[in-house]
A protein has these predicted regions:
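Aromatic- and carboxylate-lined catalytic core of secreted/periplasmic carbohydrate-active enzymes
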Residues: 62-99
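C-terminal beta-sandwich/jelly-roll accessory domains of carbohydrate-active enzymes
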Residues: 126-188
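Single conserved hydrophobic/aromatic residue that forms the stacking wall/gate
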Residues: 1-8, 12, 184-189
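Aromatic/acidic polysaccharide-binding cleft in carbohydrate-active enzymes
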Residues: 5-6, 24-70, 160
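Carbohydrate-binding surface patches
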Residues: 101-136
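Active-site rim elements
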Residues: 9, 13, 64-74, 174-180
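Alpha-amylase-like alpha-glycosidases and glucanotransferases acting on alpha-linked glucans and related
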Residues: 5-9, 13-28, 39, 93-96, ...
Length: 189
């Protein structure tokens, strides 16, 4: 089915964006990127050698792919640029601790805090969540990046203007420490 194929391709692009963001947001000093990976280049690099018959076939990058409007590589390139911009604005980001907030294998949801950024990922291949509770430091959270944003090839299911206030839960209040509360989020697949 063409629809199934398109949906599978969308899922692959979304996973590509999230894996790259998880990698970047957990850096510990450096960020390694391979040529063309920033926009999901479809082929590998293989320089001429005896094992490939001294072929030049894969010894190049198709840099024009990211600029072509008839293809989807532009969305991966735009997401890559946006996520790097956000992280680069944080001074000494790599020195800030990663605080795991949620790791739910059944739901395939991962959430962690780094500096003042809350990262939430839904890796489930077909299950979206509405009102998913994440236990986080009490406060207000706003969207600054979403892999679901149409600018990055997403469906636009997240309203980027919505701010999320945490809801206090006394069961999770810690003695003499910053209180934690639930924030409820929509997590599209």
């Amino acid at each position: 089915h063409l629809c199934d194929r398109r949906q599978r391709q969308m899922c692959i692009r979304d996973r590509h964006k999230m894996i790259r963001l998880v990698t970047l947001s957990t850096i510990n000093g450096g960020y390694l990127n391979f040529m063309g990976n920033e926009f999901g280049h479809p082929e590998w690099i293989d320089f001429p050698r005896q094992g490939n018959g001294w072929s030049y076939k894969y010894a190049h990058r198709q840099w024009d792919l990211v600029d072509r409007n008839d293809l989807k590589y532009q969305y991966l390139g735009a997401f890559d640029e946006a996520m790097i911009h956000i992280i680069s604005q944080k001074k000494k980001f790599e020195r800030t601790p990663i605080v795991k907030l949620c790791e739910n294998d059944g739901d395939q949801v991962l959430a962690f805090l780094r500096d003042d950024l809350l990262f939430v990922f839904n890796f489930h291949p077909f299950k979206s969540f509405n009102g998913y509770g994440i236990l986080a430091p009490t406060g207000e959270y706003e969207h600054i990046l979403s892999s679901d944003d149409p600018a990055f090839g997403g469906y636009g299911l997240i309203d980027m203007k919505v701010k999320h206030l945490t809801r206090h839960d006394p069961l999770f209040e810690k003695d003499n420490k910053e209180s934690v509360s639930y924030t409820h989020l929509t997590l599209p697949t």
